[in-house]
């Protein structure tokens, strides 16, 4: 068989130290898992009840359109309706479907370091991945992104807040970036961590996506909603973009369990907000501990903190964190903000 040449440099998305992570997930191996930016709480009671009610219907295919989920998303984002909503098997599928819409050949720009899946998605679709370095302060520089745009640029992906740094751009900065981009370049805002942003100048991008013909937002239920195991995400965009994204979406990609759990969770927005506020308070506590210990860290707006120290420091205290090496930060650790007891272990590791 002859394989596509552009697949040669790609490798499967595989978290490092997978065997240790699996042991931590099972509660064996004596380790607490704070590697993957997951929520330490399970689904909301409303989501659990919806799952129990839906279980007898598991012999039937789910709603292909995920209408109830789209309605819940639209209701949570003023100014949008179901025709503006994208759904997918995690926000990763939403991102992939958006990139499937652009012309090829061409290139995709994104800041770097950022979410490591972007180069793989671009490569599988036959698009070249171009990395634009972050500043020395670990921030995205919009001017650098704009300077990197060429006639071959088809899309720009902005992880905001950025993973693994937790730094962010304000709505004003994002709007200015969208204004300056050529109209035929798609700006994708990956907002997986948007619920954890404390800066009021950040919020409101969904309106930007509804107003602009070349802007789309991708979000997930894997973080603040605590539904990572169900693989469900959503997006917001113009009716035209949403229509084309639905044309390329794999049928039934959002299963029954994911649909009902995500719908119930989205409808309980006040409880999700309370969870996010807890994470923000705990993040501030962990950052304060890093500061008092004299460690260099990046002030974060996500549910994680990037700190300049070896993962071994935390592992000795029974905490498994993400190694910075594969994330573009050798010698650093990315620490997920967990529950109070888990964060106590992180702080206790500092001595």
Swiss-Prot record:
GO MF, one example: pyridoxal phosphate binding
Question: Which parts of the chain are coiled coil?
Answer: none
Tell me, which GO biological process terms does this entry list?
L-histidine biosynthetic process
Tell me which InterPro entries the record gives: Aminotransferase_I/II_large (IPR004839), HisP_aminotrans (IPR005861), HistidinolP_aminotransfase (IPR050106), PyrdxlP-dep_Trfase (IPR015424), PyrdxlP-dep_Trfase_major (IPR015421), PyrdxlP-dep_Trfase_small (IPR015422)
- Pathway this chain belongs to: Amino-acid biosynthesis; L-histidine biosynthesis; L-histidine from 5-phospho-alpha-D-ribose 1-diphosphate: step 7/9
Q: What's the catalysed reaction? A: L-histidinol phosphate + 2-oxoglutarate = 3-(imidazol-4-yl)-2-oxopropyl phosphate + L-glutamate
What EC class does the entry list?
transferase
- Identify the keywords attached in UniProt to this record, alphabetized: Amino-acid biosynthesis, Aminotransferase, Histidine biosynthesis, Pyridoxal phosphate, Transferase
What Pfam families does its record include? Aminotran_1_2
Keyword Transferase carried by entry? yes
Modified residue annotations for N6-(pyridoxal phosphate)lysine: 223
State its Enzyme Commission number(s): 2.6.1.9
Could you confirm whether the keyword Transferase appears in this record? Answer: yes
Disordered: region residues: 1-26
Q: Cofactor(s) for this protein?
A: pyridoxal 5'-phosphate
| SUBUNIT field | Homodimer.
Spell out the family assignment given in the record's similarity comment.
Belongs to the class-II pyridoxal-phosphate-dependent aminotransferase family. Histidinol-phosphate aminotransferase subfamily.
Name of this protein: Histidinol-phosphate aminotransferase
What species was this sequence derived from?
A: Rubrobacter xylanophilus (strain DSM 9941 / JCM 11954 / NBRC 16129 / PRD-1)
Which gene produces this protein?
Answer: hisC
